Amino acid sequence: MEEEDEEARALLAGGPDEADRGAPAAPGALPALCDPSRLVHRLLVLLLMCFLGFGSYFCYDNPAALQTQVKRDMQVNTTKFMLLYAWYSWSNVVLCFFGGFLIDRVFGIRWGTIIFSCFVCIGQVVFALGGIFNAFWLMEFGRFVFGIGGESLAVAQNTYAVSWFKGKELNLVFGLQLSMARIGSTVNMNLMGWLYSKIEALLGSAGHTTLGITLMIGGVTCILSLICALALAYLDQRAERILHKEQGKTGEVIKLTDVKDFSLPLWLIFIICVCYYVAVFPFIGLGKVFFTEKFGFSSQAASAINSVVYVISAPMSPVFGLLVDKTGKNIIWVLCAVAATLVSHMMLAFTMWNPWIAMCLLGLSYSLLACALWPMVAFVVPEHQLGTAHGFMQSIQNLGLAIISIIAGMILDSRGYLFLEVFFIACVSLSLLSVVLLYLVNRAQGGNLNYSARQREEIKFSHTE
């Protein structure tokens, strides 16, 4: 206890006010990097937060990066291959409701983050062992375990962000976390195929063992995330002791009875969300072979173009977030994003134009939609129902991804890529129709979903008077 008191006194002696005035630090004061009240220390915490989710995002799309190898080495068709994505989503259909509850009421943010990071690590190891032992059912089980940790780890990551950063800083922090997640996905798409070829050359042949070892090496990124979780737990506990700050909480209150009170605009937002994302993530999961077969790309080039959605999303998500914040008009931005995605899929399906054009358009629209759609939930539900609304939205999104992943695999096995693209076009068209309905319903009800930023500021100001 005496050592802790001495550390606290040392930090307080060289507090931020003195540093800002250029006053000399008191004797025994610790450097700014060790002071949880200083910006430099919080930037260190931010770095750890960003890498906390890197491993799970890197490994999530391991199957997409190794689509050809998985199907060949494990001797499975596309329908079974897409189960690797479906099992990830199945585990989150229910868990999305309880991730925040487990962090707030059961584990706490520190232990919750560590436990969910362990699930991600264990899931990836089991997934890799399934390849080594030529047991596809074990790979499926590994993806299910991986999914248990993946989505909840993202909740924990956001909870840490809210605990350490406030106000305008928070939007930038969320943008940086999302960018790092997309970088993880991009690195995976462009690295895993190359890594497989190196392991193949080392072992002298392709096969399930080569696949398993490649996936196991990829799992090192999950260990990196676990190390970040442990470091964050230590730094957060230390900051709580020194600054007497409260441990971070999600603040989510989940009440399933709230579902009956959801308004029509909220249900339309749910439909837009599901119908849009089922035409993006399963497409990326199956995209590598599509670009190889239709456009004659090499394996490496196909991986590069398949990852361009994430490449664009990394820098553009914060930019579009700022744009939507400054302009408002969320429904119009969502309409533009969904319409652009529809054009992108139609170009890929019915033309032989350079697919880089369509994929860049898809990357821009995907980034814009996330920035404009998700904030609308807060405009149509009371604050006490936000936790339930977000949980339900994530739950049905995962349900849709689980079902559509299987259907997409079946269509590809029986009909080919053209029919699969037509199916994705139908999904995006339904999303577009829902956006138009949302615009009309919002206008008829006098809702605020399409207000400009100035109108929202005026309403907020009038309520404070």
From Swiss-Prot:
Keywords: Lysosome, Membrane, Transmembrane, Transmembrane helix, Transport. Lysosomal dipeptide uniporter that selectively exports lysine, arginine or histidine-containing dipeptides with a net positive charge from the lysosome lumen into the cytosol. Could play a role in a specific type of protein O-glycosylation indirectly regulating macrophages migration and tissue invasion. Also essential for liver homeostasis. It catalyses: L-alpha-aminoacyl-L-arginine(out) = L-alpha-aminoacyl-L-arginine(in); L-arginyl-L-alpha-amino acid(out) = L-arginyl-L-alpha-amino acid(in); L-arginyl-glycine(out) = L-arginyl-glycine(in); L-alpha-aminoacyl-L-lysine(out) = L-alpha-aminoacyl-L-lysine(in). This is Lysosomal dipeptide transporter MFSD1. It is a multi-pass membrane protein. GO terms for molecular function: dipeptide uniporter activity; protein homodimerization activity. GO terms for cellular component: lysosomal membrane; lysosome. It comes from Pongo abelii (Sumatran orangutan). Residues 1-23 are annotated as: Disordered. It is found in: Lysosome membrane. Pfam families: MFS_1. Belongs to the major facilitator superfamily. Its main location: membrane. Homodimer. Interacts with lysosomal protein GLMP (via lumenal domain); the interaction starts while both proteins are still in the endoplasmic reticulum and is required for stabilization of MFSD1 in lysosomes but has no direct effect on its targeting to lysosomes or transporter activity. A motif (Dileucine internalization motif) lies at residues 11-12. The chain crosses the membrane at residues 39-59, 83-103, 113-133, 135-155, 170-191, 213-233, 266-286, 304-324, 331-351, 361-381, 392-412, 418-438. GO terms for biological process: dipeptide transmembrane transport from lysosomal lumen to cytosol; protein localization to lysosome; protein stabilization. The dileucine internalization motif is required for lysosomal localization.
